Amino acid sequence: MVMIVFRSRLRADADLPALEPVGARMYELASSMPGFISYKDFQAEDKEGLTLVEFDSAEHLRAWREHPEHVAAQEFGREKVFESYEITVCNPIRRYSFSKDKGRVESA
């Protein structure tokens, strides 16, 4: 698994009405890509945005990164939306979960 951590701050004059359909399309596109696992958006109280995207392999992540619509959305974001952003690509070192039914479960 590969996880992308996308941290961002919007410009004061960000084109928010134009951003909503672009964001919706990026979710639709990412979730239809081979190897897609999940896509989650969060916003902190200080207005920093955080998006987590998971793919099952670096190859599938690369296909997402290079998809023409995603490349165009990145350009739109740099020109019209973001004051700044930072992308971190992660490979999990350890993974485990907890549920009331199963308790703690170690994953790969």
Language model features with spans:
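Conserved hydrophobic/aromatic residues on the N-lobe beta-strands of protein kinase domains
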Residues: 51-52
